[in-house]
Amino acid sequence: MSLDDRLAAPRAMAPEMCSLNMGTMNFALYPAAARITEWRHDWEKPFLEGSDDLVFKNTPRDIARILQDLGAERSARFEFECYDIGHLEMLRHFADRGLVAPPFFIQFVFGVLG
């Protein structure tokens, strides 16, 4: 999915607040496939099993564009999702550049392979 595709809904809906992952990462959910015995939908198992090759792209350029497009231009506030220490450093980087200012709403997400 392109960045424009990802931005289409928040551009149309103009939320007051939205989530922003602070970096590119793997969402390696495949270990769950071995633990689940009943599936509700036929896409669930292949999706989980295939997550060992899934990358969620959110580069510094992507993040800067999101901050500009939704934040500066549409006044959205962000809930910054940080999955590791590097994501906190990325947030500091954008604060140092003046693209985002405190107070920060930070969601620490731990326990995801990635």
Predicted stretch roles:
Residues S2-M13, G86-H93:
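Catalytic cores of alpha/beta
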Residues M17-G114:
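Catalytic alpha/beta core domains of metabolic enzymes, predominantly
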